[in-house]
Curated annotation (Swiss-Prot):
Subcellular location: Cell inner membrane
Subunit details: Homodimer.
Protein family per UniProt: In the C-terminal section; belongs to the bacterial STING family.
UniProt keyword annotation of Transmembrane present: yes
GO biological process, one term: defense response to virus
Cellular component terms per the entry's GO annotation: plasma membrane
Organism per entry: Flavobacteriaceae sp. genome_bin_11
InterPro entries the record matches: Prok_STING
Protein's recorded name: CD-NTase-associated protein 13
């Protein structure tokens, strides 16, 4: 089933054409059904099938295909966010958790920052978040993790009483969606581009974290990873 769904994602136009064809067929059958008695009388045609049942069956198919098409279109719209989430998890989060455990920590905690907008990931805002963490009596330091199968990465540690309380990361990979957002909004005819851009950014970020959370659950890491916003809820 997964292979079929993957194929449909790259050929969604087929679903669209089939749905359109079924709509046309359904419309024709409805007309025949409405004028069934006239057709029988004028053309002396005897219908051996239940036209009403056929219309109902085709209608169910159309609803199912339209729902599938809607899902495919949504996935196509947000596919860059999904791809980034997969890359971020496989190339950093999962190897980082693995390496930290191999270094001797039994139950490491990583808190991933969840912004509402890309601007929250600028260096100025990151410095502000770090200041807030310091005000919460955390001692901040950065360590370099040598990850197996991935490049080494720096990660922020939040320390209390000379012990590592948890790790903290800003997913700067989200900033690579800037150009995608600009492209999508520029290709739109909607005049309220700034408002639309803001909403689209929020949706992309939300989809990124939904996919990331899905991967976290699939790999049984819900006890190791949390999300927190600018109010630092979740630490």
């Amino acid at each position: 089933m997964e292979k079929i769904y993957t194929w449909l994602k790259t050929n969604s136009y087929i679903v669209h054409h089939v749905s359109t064809s079924l709509n046309i067929i359904s419309f024709i059958i409805v007309l025949i059904w409405i004028f069934e008695s006239t057709i029988k009388e004028k053309l002396n045609i005897i219908f051996t099938v239940n036209l009403e049942a056929i219309v109902v069956f085709i209608s169910i198919l159309i609803v199912g295909l339209n729902q599938l098409l809607q899902k495919l279109l949504i996935e196509a719209e947000y596919s860059p966010a999904f791809a980034l989430a997969v890359g971020y998890f496989k190339n950093f989060i999962f190897p980082a958790i693995t390496q930290i455990k191999e270094n001797g920590e039994v139950n490491p905690k990583i808190c991933i920052y969840k912004p509402k907008h890309f601007d929250e990931l600028t260096s100025t805002n990151i410095d502000m978040i770090k200041a807030e963490l310091t005000n919460k009596k955390y001692n901040l330091s950065e360590i370099n993790l040598s990850l197996k199968g991935a490049r080494a990465r720096d990660i922020l540690t939040l320390n209390k009483k000379s012990k590592i309380h948890s790790y903290f990361d800003f997913p700067n990979t989200l900033l690579s969606l800037y150009s995608y957002v600009d492209f999508k909004i520029a290709s739109s005819n909607n005049n309220s581009s700034e408002l639309k851009k803001k909403k689209f950014v929020e949706l992309l970020i939300e989809q990124f974290y939904l996919k990331l959370n899905e991967l976290i659950q699939e790999n049984n890491l819900t006890n190791n990873i949390t999300f927190c916003d600018k109010n630092l809820q979740g630490l």
